[in-house]
């Protein structure tokens, strides 16, 4: 399962990107879960609060908090997430390199470019062994391996529980 966040202050754009990604993922037989955010602050707060994403599609110029500031906050918590900027503003490209973006897509997004970018990003995610992935209560989770000290498994009422300690 690839966990994706989409963040843009234009609701129409987030809808188009989400629909496009779902079509592409279906064609490539890649299961995805998407969360949509309409400002960088809520996305950064979600990541700080424990939400983990493999790929973030992020606009740069947004009203409340721009994509570069949001990415800087996200990088403090998750150094490995792939950030793909989706923007109409090429002039911010050099400024954004401080947060190590994976790719840039220019608006309006061409589905062929999106598919190529998504495929390469998914290959990068699948080649990355830096996370322990598991499902619990129908939700997919990923924990950075560097944060895991040990695993402990207990049987309570027929179910298994895995504990993570930092």
How would you label these PLM feature ranges?
Residues 15-24, 43-44, 71:
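Short, well-ordered amphipathic alpha-helices
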